[in-house]
Amino acid sequence: MRSEEALKRLHKSVVSCRKCPRLVIYLEEITNRKPKRYQQWDYWGKPLPSFGDPQARLLIVGLAPAAHGGARTGRMFTGDRSGEWLFSALHEAGFSNRPKSDRRDDDLTLSDCYITATIHCAPPKNKPLPQEIENCRPYLLEEFRLLKKVRIILALGQIAFTQTLRSLRLVGYEIPNLPFGHGRLYRVSRREGGKDFLRSDRRADLSTGAVKILATYHPSQQNTQTGRLTRPMFRQIFEKIREEIGEEQ
């Protein structure tokens, strides 16, 4: 219960954050200049909090909210094409009670899964600046501390993968330069007593100082429309997650 309360406080801090002037201005611009198809929407127009199950064993790290997706609806991956792919896959794998979500006040619930992002504000052209990523990093570090049951982290895209590794290093994980690749799975842990960072003799979760990292192409339109990421490829990622979680039970 304490971690749940702490996560709620963290969410409030995220929503009220104004550390990045460029992103604050951009959110105001997209809120005031809605495309015709969304004229009737009351845009969220603020940083987006993470959401999901506080007891989750799966942590998903995305890049950033979409300008007319999450920044409009008020929930990550809600109301955009990437979200359609993600929630469909989560539902099929048993992590979500719905295969689709269009607004934050629907009854979508995540089970054993928690969704966060590298940054919590929609950036212009979907490209956050390095300092903006650093400004948001403390939120991810705090989530690592609070989400103690996480056994596997799914990084959506290369930026999320790189920033996840950097954040884990900051909380004591000894991680070499691991290459990004769709479907690549790594197991890392904190260095203890000079032992190697790879450990096979303990359960992997954030509470024990060991975790698995799985990389995938981001389900962006750029990747899905070109065939770089297909439905079967994305489905296999979540089948792998189920296998890995099952092995740790």
Functional labels for PLM-detected ranges:
Residues L185:
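Conserved flavin/dinucleotide-binding core of flavoenzymes
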